[in-house]
Every structure is written in structure tokens, then in C-alpha cells.
Amino acid sequence: MTEYRSASIIIPVDDDYKEFVMAYVSQELKSKLAPKIKAICKKHGVKASLAVRNHSTLVLNVKSGKIDFIGDYGDSPETRADAEKFGIQVNPYHYKNHFNGDAYFFLSEVIPAMNAGNWDKSDIQVDYFNVGWYIDVNIGKWNKPYALEA
């Protein structure tokens, strides 16, 4: 497995300088991960685009498809109504608790594919986050909802 080097920054800490690795995703990395992600989308009948935001986040924007993300999301009618109106920003750490059915199976494949070669050496107790890059999965957008295809 290939591990990708992120950008680093040198910061003065306690009269000394320490190097910190920052989350970084390049267009080159996106193009290496894209074929696998696109294949998963095609397998599940989902139309999506892949983007890089702020050089730190790999973003998958799901626009339309055969998966009923709204129906497979949340337990309450209020949650589903908000999702229909504003879209869904998937939590990549807790999607297993929020989705079921086909949406769960799609996310269970695409999120690990987006994280291929990534690392997470974060220490939450000291509020220090060290990841190769972040990922976001958006189902629809606030101004253009997800389109369920028959």
C-alpha cells in the first residue's frame, strides 16, 4: 500500500521548533483514487463527482442515483424532511449508525476507498489531529437536492 506524504509546517513550541504534518490531498492523489471510487459509484448506480477542497479534504458529491439515501437515513420523519430539503453531509466516522439498506452498503465501500493510503494518528486528548487528509461525502446540496432515479 502506498502511503502519501502530507505537507508539513514548522512551529515554535516551548523555545524549540517542531515539525507538524498537515492534512494534504493533491490533484495527483485524487486522480489515483478516482478510478476505484468511480467504479464503486457505477456498481451502485450513483452519479457523483470527486473534488479537492482547501488542499486538505477529498470530497465526494453524490448528485443522483438508484439508492434511496433519504429513505435509508435516520429514524425520524423530521430528520428525513431536513435531508430532502438540505441534503445530507455524511459523517464518515459514524455513517454505520445513521444509514441502513443500500445506502449503508454503498458508504461501506466508498468511504474506505476514499481513505486508501490515509492515516489517522490523532490524539483527541490533547486536541492534536494528524491525518493524511480529511474526507467528506455530500448527498445532494442545499440548493440542489439528491435526485432519486427509478
Summary of predicted features, one role per range:
Residues 7-9, 21, 83, 114:
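Extended hydrophobic/Leu-rich segments
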Residues 42-47, 119:
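Structural alpha-beta junctions
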Residues 6, 10, 26, 30, ...:
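Intrinsic-disorder-associated interaction segments
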Residues 49-53:
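Short beta-strand
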Residues 1-15:
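Charged, low-complexity intrinsically disordered tails and linkers
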Residues 66-150:
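C-terminal basic regulatory modules in eukaryotic proteins
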Residues 13-19, 23-40, 44, 54-56, ...:
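Catalytic phosphate/metal-binding cores of nucleic-acid and nucleotide-processing enzymes, i.e., regions
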